[in-house]
From Swiss-Prot:
Function, in words: This enzyme is involved in nucleotide metabolism: it produces dUMP, the immediate precursor of thymidine nucleotides and it decreases the intracellular concentration of dUTP so that uracil cannot be incorporated into DNA.
Family statement drawn from the similarity comment of this UniProt entry: Belongs to the dUTPase family.
Catalytic activity of the protein: dUTP + H2O = dUMP + diphosphate + H(+)
Documented EC number(s): 3.6.1.23
Pathway involvement of the protein, from the record: Pyrimidine metabolism; dUMP biosynthesis; dUMP from dCTP (dUTP route): step 2/2
Signal peptide from the UniProt entry: none
Protein's organism: Streptomyces avermitilis (strain ATCC 31267 / DSM 46492 / JCM 5070 / NBRC 14893 / NCIMB 12804 / NRRL 8165 / MA-4680)
Gene that encodes the chain: dut
UniProt keyword annotations, A-Z: Hydrolase, Magnesium, Metal-binding, Nucleotide metabolism
Cofactor(s) demanded: Mg(2+)
Protein's name according to its UniProt entry: Deoxyuridine 5'-triphosphate nucleotidohydrolase
Length: 175
């Protein structure tokens, strides 16, 4: 069953910026573009304007996600990914980018695609304080407790989680 697209009011802060758009059918995120050119040296970050502001319907929020190609090819990440755009916010959407590449600078030109905007329905909740939470299969297991990566497993004391290779990596000269 296909639903009708949600109408979201949008104002161009920069009259020349292309509207956010989905690159392919079925994409979850619409591409956001920067309205300013910028060069980031290794380790630098910047707040880039997108030239758009939105009015989301009550009960919705938008989330600014990184573009995987920028991460894979250039080492660009979003500092607060995902960034949250609340329904009541009317200011320009801005994206906080950081260059994580240790050697190469990255350059953004005006209207380069820098992030994706995902609009989702969100629930408001009422928090109810209790003395004890009900049991669950996971209990208090967190941060690597489910394994799935070579660096996440039993440490030398047989405890699950943690990074048993951290001391090996940090003891290498020059690292």
């Amino acid at each position: 069953m296909t639903r009708a697209p949600l109408n979201v009011l949008l104002r161009r802060v920069d009259p020349d910026v292309p509207l956010p758009a989905y690159e392919h059918p079925g994409d979850a995120g619409a591409d956001l573009r920067t309205t300013e050119s910028c060069e980031l040296k290794p380790g630098e970050r910047a707040v880039l304007p997108t030239g758009v502001s939105v009015a989301l319907p009550e009960g919705y929020a938008a989330f600014v996600h990184p573009r995987s190609g920028l991460a894979a090819r250039c080492g660009v990440a979003l500092v607060n990914a995902p960034g949250t755009v609340d329904a009541g916010y009317r200011g320009e959407i801005k994206v906080i980018v950081v260059n994580l590449d240790p050697r190469e600078s990255v350059r953004f030109e005006r209207f380069d695609r820098i992030a994706q905007l995902v609009v989702q329905q969100v629930e408001r909740v009422r928090f109810q304080e209790v003395a004890e939470l009900p049991d669950s299969a996971r209990a208090e297991g967190g941060f690597g407790s489910t394994g799935g990566h070579a660096a996440v497993g039993a440490d030398t004391n047989g405890q699950q989680g943690g990074n048993r290779y951290a001391s090996v990596v940090s003891d290498r000269k020059g690292q």
